[in-house]
Amino acid sequence: MKFAIIVPARKGSKTVKDKNLYKLKNKSLVEYTFNQIKNLNFKKFILSNDERILRKASKYKINILYKRPKETSGSKSSTVKTLLHFVKWLKIYDKDISELVVLQPTSPLRERKDIINAINIYKKKKFYSLFSISESLEHPYEAINIKNLKNNSWNYVLKKSKKFYRRQDFDINSYFINGAIYIININKLKQFKSIVTNNHGLYVMRKFNSFDINDFEDFKIAKKLI
């Protein structure tokens, strides 16, 4: 197995303008990921259509930069589509790389040890794919679907199997995909057209390290956590 670290960081965002470059304390958001990977002994690729992000990557001695083409840089372009386009180029650049470790820039509290531990589990268990998860902040039994707020029309998203009097007695252990780490075998990515395969692993992260930034409110919270 030969791993490569991939950081997809496109230009712009619908929720926060230039989110990956938005300042969080003394660094831009994407720099937290650059800092996490700078001493890892893997080839590193920054996938971006923003020259400013590519320049920042160079400052962290991440010199393998891949400028995303227009067709994989829009807000509707999925991570899978971006990766599939990238591996075509990668086949020419370094055909020995077999596994991709994808790190979203929106996880500034992810730690270097999380990345290493996830890779080690992936290798030990011989998975084809893996993603990181953490315990849900709220249980799905307590989630509701609002059909019409004005008419106070709603229902529970997940029906309980029986009546529970205490939250700790719920019969489902609820976790969510936190988006911090994805690992995928390149051949399986091309086969399944997905980052989830028929031999998939999970890596459990602490809630604190799983914090994901999507909007301005998240930035405000993150500033207090960092």
Per-segment meaning from a language model:
Residues K2-V7, V30, K44-I46:
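Hydrophobic targeting segments
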Residues L40-F45, Y128, F208-N209:
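Short active-site oxyanion
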Residues R52-V101, L109-R110, I116-N117:
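Short phosphate-binding loop-to-helix
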Residues Q191, L202-I226:
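Hydrophobic helical membrane-anchoring modules
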Residues K81, E99, P108-N199, V204-M205:
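Conserved core of the sugar-phosphate nucleotidyltransferase
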Residues L29-K44, R55-K56, Y60:
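A short, N-terminal amphipathic alpha-helix
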Residues M1-K17:
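N-terminal nucleotide-binding beta1-loop-alpha1 segment
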Residues Y22-K23, I46, V102, F211:
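Conserved SAM-binding loop
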